[in-house]
Amino acid sequence: MSNPESLKKQVEPPGYNELFMVEDVCNVDLEQGLDLCKPEKVNKQSQRSRQSRQSLFTNTIKPQKDKMNIKTNKIKEFLNDLFTEFSKFHNSYYPDGRISTRSNFRWPLLIIWSIIIVFAVDKKFEVQKFLSIWINENRFYSEIWVPIAIYVCLLVLMLLSLIFFAEFAVLALRVTGVIIAVLGAVLGMIIAVLGMIIAALGMIIAALGATITGLLYFGHWALYKLVILSLGFKIVTPGDVCVSNTLPTHNGETALHSETTVGSDIEQIELQNMPTPVKK
């Protein structure tokens, strides 16, 4: 006969036997009696699900920002490339206030500028004619070579002046810029100080005006009070005026009298109450 405990073990599901006793039935493989999800697996799956949700959230919320960042980065790269190419083209870096002279176009430009300056000077001051006359007087004149030599000498002089005086010209430009900036700052400070002075004067004038107005008003009020009190007048306000009894006048009209006028008008009232003589 079989043991009843063995029968009980066979009848019960593997998940409830003594060997594989677990609390959560949903995470148990009933066929093999094993845990479906161990804590490590559960943590990994929860982390993956959380990361997936975060990625979905970021993908749905931040695509526009990513696109904007990409566009701005492309624009910055384009501007940087353009600046570097432009700098390479004319080679005008300014480290420590110095100008580099490594450009390939420097000598052709200097020669062109020298030729233009030579012709301008010759047209203005007639240098070639003056030197030709001087050479002719000293018997060194030649119709072809002397003018050419004169122009070549002038060209060399212009080149040397442009080469050696370029640094002085740049220094003069820098000094001029600094002077203009300093003068602008000084003028701005002077204008600001003048504005502050004008504003202070305006405030002082306004305060003086208010003070003078207050003094005049107080003096007028004090003088008015002194005059009223010295003359013995009594100031009657609209609230102090009361309506007296209506008294008939000789015209049959009613008159309003205040308390101050009742005592002084007794004689007039008696005269009004007297019978008027009847004409025959």
Curated annotation (Swiss-Prot):
Compartments, as annotated in UniProt: Membrane
Topology term for the membrane: Multi-pass membrane protein
Keyword annotations from UniProtKB, A to Z: Membrane, Transmembrane, Transmembrane helix
Gene Ontology CC: external side of plasma membrane
Transmembrane segments annotated in the record for this chain: 107-127, 144-164, 178-198, 199-219
Main location: membrane
Signal sequence region: none
Pfam families cross-referenced by the UniProt entry: DUF999
Entry similarity comment: Belongs to the UPF0494 family.
Protein name: UPF0494 membrane protein SPAC212.01c
Organism: Schizosaccharomyces pombe (strain 972 / ATCC 24843) (Fission yeast)
